[in-house]
Regions:
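Pre-active-site segment of Zn-dependent metallo-hydrolases
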Residues: 6-65, 69-120, 167-179
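Metal-dependent phosphodiesterase/nuclease catalytic metal-binding core
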Residues: 3-4, 123, 128-189
């Protein structure tokens, strides 16, 4: 998650779940250090849950702004986020039934219904389509990682910032290669 703020606009670039070790997963339950009411938009690089999986939590906590992403990423998120919610529900039932863990009544971080509802926020963007959110302009360019994966180029306050997302290989037989970045003031990888 990268938080980008100007004087008038706040966007979050990627909004993923922590995965892997338990101490990392527990961070998903912590409150984000941002005011959701002041968040104008989410810019999403691709569908993998470590980049998109926290969007239903934002939705559940009241975020109703747009989630801008490539149309293929939107289609993949429709499947992945609903499945993530379902798996979390099933895990909570299993932990409860077998009295595992430290909680008397384990709860999922979010459920399938919330994940499906959060999809209403998604707005499809084509590669190279210029989008404005407040005083921030951005566009997506192909990253070659998975279908719809994008790097995001943001222009704000006279600076150009690149967010790589996950970048694929130049010699992949199935994916188009990632596009080289334009001249940037800052690249976040």
């Amino acid at each position: 998650k990268f938080l980008l703020k100007t004087e008038t606009t706040t966007v979050l670039v990627d909004c993923g779940l922590f995965q892997g070790y338990k101490w990392l997963r527990e961070r998903n339950w912590q409150t984000l250090p941002l005011d959701i009411d002041k968040l104008d938009a989410v810019l999403l690089t691709h569908a993998h849950l470590d980049h998109s999986g926290y969007i239903p939590v934002l939705y559940e906590r009241g975020f109703r702004g747009p989630v801008f992403t490539h149309h293929a990423t939107k289609a993949l998120c429709q499947i992945l986020l609903a499945d993530s919610g379902h798996i979390q529900e099933e895990d909570a039932k299993y932990y409860s039934k077998h009295k595992l863990g430290k909680h008397a009544h384990p709860e999922p971080l979010y459920d399938r219904q919330t994940a499906e509802a959060s999809m209403r926020l998604f707005q499809s963007v084509e590669f190279d389509e210029q989008i404005e959110v407040g005083d921030i302009r951005f566009y997506l360019q192909p990253a070659g990682h998975i279908l719809g994966a994008a790097s995001i180029i943001v222009e704000a306050e006279g600076k150009r910032i690149g967010f790589s997302g996950d970048v694929g290989r130049f010699d992949d037989v199935l994916m188009k290669p990632p596009r080289p970045f334009p001249e940037l003031d800052l690249l976040l990888m």
